[in-house]
Amino acid sequence: MGNPRLSLEWEDEAYVLSARSHGETGAIVELLTEARGKVAAHVAGAASRRMKPFLQPGARVIVRYRAKVEGQLGSATLEPMGEGPSSLFDDRLALAGLSAAAAVAAAALPEREAHPGAFHALEALIRVLEIPEIWPAVYVRYEAGLLQELGFGLDLSKCAATGAFDDLVYVSPRTGRAVSREAGKPYHDKLLPLPPFMLSSQGGLAEGDVKAGLDITGHFLEQFVFGPLNRPLPPARLWLLDRLAEADKL
């Protein structure tokens, strides 16, 4: 069938990242697929009551896409898969997490470039959004995964200064590499605190851990992804931090 990214007609599963009105009844919808990456398409009838529920960020859909010319905006029809984010409608905090995840992916990922790791990271986050005790930490790992997928992965395997593997408690804001307690002590005020959950999935979360993790991923998203594009972090990402603070989840 050839390269799926170059095909002018295809069918695939996708997550909705965003939808904005276009014309009287249509919308331009950004979708994240596993094989084709982020794809935008015009969806007719998107304003209808039937379609609105599965045009929300994080909804999983079957996409049937067609384009006349490679590189130009194509059209698509969408069919829902499962309940989608409607199951979270009573959980405003989880919805804020889902909206932030979709907004960051929509703003960070390039068009028509396969990033299967980003697709699976979003999938993993959505699966745990109904578990309030753990999803904020998974969200941090999601953003770290996006950085990795885009070529800006954090190196938390050992101390950048000494090569030590133990007692890693900082991250260099310049390089994204871990720093041990001993090596980082003289530069404590200039380093980013590294929460233990970013090193291991074992153990619980302490107060301040999620905030520290979001500070790390937010810093490097700004430095490596959005800064070069002269863009700030998406508003939905900033709102998530506010909502988590209000819920005492940081």
UniProtKB/Swiss-Prot annotation:
InterPro entries: ARFGAP/RecO (IPR037278), DNA_rep/recomb_RecO_N (IPR022572), NA-bd_OB-fold (IPR012340), RecO (IPR003717), RecO_C (IPR042242). The keyword DNA repair applies. Disulfide bonds: none annotated. SUPFAM superfamilies: ArfGap/RecO-like zinc finger (SSF57863), Nucleic acid-binding proteins (SSF50249). Keywords: DNA damage, DNA recombination, DNA repair. The keyword DNA repair applies. GO terms for cellular component: bacterial nucleoid. One of its GO terms (biological process) is DNA recombination. Gene3D superfamilies: Nucleic acid-binding proteins, Recombination protein O, C-terminal domain. It comes from the Bacteria. Belongs to the RecO family. Involved in DNA repair and RecF pathway recombination. This is DNA repair protein RecO. It comes from Caulobacter vibrioides (strain ATCC 19089 / CIP 103742 / CB 15). The gene is recO.
